Amino acid sequence: MAKYNEKELADTSKFLSFVLRHKPEAIGIVLDREGWADIDKLILCAQKAGKRLTRALLDTVVATSDKKRFSYSSDGRCIRAVQGHSTSQVAISFAEKTPPQFLYHGTASRFLDEIKKQGLIAGERHYVHLSADEATARKVGARHGSPVILTVKAQEMAKRGIPFWQAENGVWLTSTVAVEFLEW
């Protein structure tokens, strides 16, 4: 595996998140319904847009991402963001899964008033993202300010017919979390 510095890896990961989750049209690529992009086309379009991108750099980002944000297709010809999409091009068909008793959501304290009114909503994304452990939720919340960890009564939600899915990187997904299922 080629050597890249942390800034280059972080910048490339952010770029991939942007085009594979939110704005593929920004560089002229099209994602299929499952979020897959042809790697050769991605590299070509990224380079045309002035972004240094190679297969070796992609391999390193995919292999070293602590959150496993990206995955390759079984034939190695396509790449996708595992979850977190806001683009209407993508509707990944995750398998429904029974959640553990509790899941966790990390947020910033400045968002609590709104959450107390409307619960957790997906916003521009397709799903609300939840963690199986508090440590991961804390890291997520810290990205946006002073972190607050909310406990989600996931099994209670599932018993009421609210579906959950789990992305291949372990992130739990659901469409919304009503206030009644949150513990502060």
Curated annotation (Swiss-Prot):
SUPFAM superfamilies referenced in this protein's UniProt entry, alphabetically: ADP-ribosylation
Protein family (similarity comment): Belongs to the KptA/TPT1 family.
Primary role: Removes the 2'-phosphate from RNA via an intermediate in which the phosphate is ADP-ribosylated by NAD followed by a presumed transesterification to release the RNA and generate ADP-ribose 1''-2''-cyclic phosphate (APPR>P). May function as an ADP-ribosylase.
UniProt name for this protein: Probable RNA 2'-phosphotransferase
HAMAP family, alphabetized: KptA
One example GO MF annotation: NAD+ poly-ADP-ribosyltransferase activity
PANTHER family: PUTATIVE PHOSPHOTRANSFERASE, TRNA 2'-PHOSPHOTRANSFERASE 1
